[in-house]
Regions:
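Short, conserved micro-motifs composed of acidic
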Residues: 3-6, 10-49
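Short aromatic/hydrophobic-glycine micro-motifs
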Residues: 9-10, 56, 134, 155
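Long, amphipathic alpha-helical regulatory blocks in the mid-to-C-terminal portion
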Residues: 127-137
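Mobile genetic element proteins and their domesticated derivatives, centered on retroelements
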Residues: 1-5, 19, 55, 75, ...
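Basic, alpha-helical interaction scaffolds
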Residues: 39-115, 133-134, 167-183
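Extended C-terminal regions of large enzymes
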Residues: 121, 136-203
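Short amphipathic alpha-helical coiled-coil/interface segments
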Residues: 118-129
């Protein structure tokens, strides 16, 4: 609602609105639009359409894989710009960690992504580096992700960043004394015991 949006910052824009028909929690294939006046009509929201809320693609449910696909394209695009630039190696790694990776890390706390997809993105990252002379094809990939203090290059792995984010989230929920968060903890533990998705089993 217009009043409820003020605390979030965005302004109410009727041109970006759609009508969504839901019956018993299921989106209906209803093409009825809402006519506000003679010159303005709010169109019905199609089943295959998507919208962004706080930068995350959604439909009637979270589109985790679609969000990962879009974010990974932007991540690799930024990496290509960084590693084809005349920056020094140290600055390229810093830019990769602080400018490119946040495209994905912003979404990690709320998304559920397969490890195989994240490993593929890490391989694409190394491919970009090789193509731009930032890494020798035969050089150890493990050294790439070690800190510079111990002989590595300090690059952050997407897979590792995702795991760290999920572990921190699980620890925060598990150690919280907030009554509301305890309800989340109990629900997650119950889900884990039944073999369903949970913050404790997502890895």
């Amino acid at each position: 609602m217009p009043g409820g949006q003020r605390c979030l910052g965005p302004r109410w824009n009727p041109k970006k609105c759609s009508v969504l028909h839901v019956k018993r929690g299921v989106q209906q294939e209803d093409n009825d639009s809402i006519k506000l006046d003679e010159s303005f009509v709010i169109q019905s929201f199609k089943q295959q359409s998507h919208y962004k809320f706080l930068g995350v693609l959604e439909n009637t449910k979270q589109e985790d894989l679609l969000a990962l696909e879009c974010a990974s394209k932007e991540y690799l695009k930024r990496l290509s710009v960084i590693w084809s630039s005349p920056l020094s190696d140290v600055n390229k790694v810093t830019a990769s960690n602080q400018y490119a990776l946040p495209v994905l890390s912003y979404l990690m706390p709320t998304q559920r992504w397969p490890m195989s997809k994240l490993q593929r993105i890490d391989r694409e990252v190394r491919k970009v580096m090789v193509e731009n002379g930032g890494k020798h094809p035969a050089r150890s990939s493990a050294l790439l992700y070690l800190p510079r203090a111990v002989g590595g290059r300090g690059m952050k792995s997407v897979e590792t960043a995702y795991k760290v984010t999920k572990i921190k989230t699980a620890l925060k929920i598990h150690g919280s004394t907030d009554p509301t968060v305890k309800l989340v903890k109990n629900w997650d533990e119950n889900s884990a015991s039944k073999g369903r998705h949970s913050v404790y089993t997502i890895l």
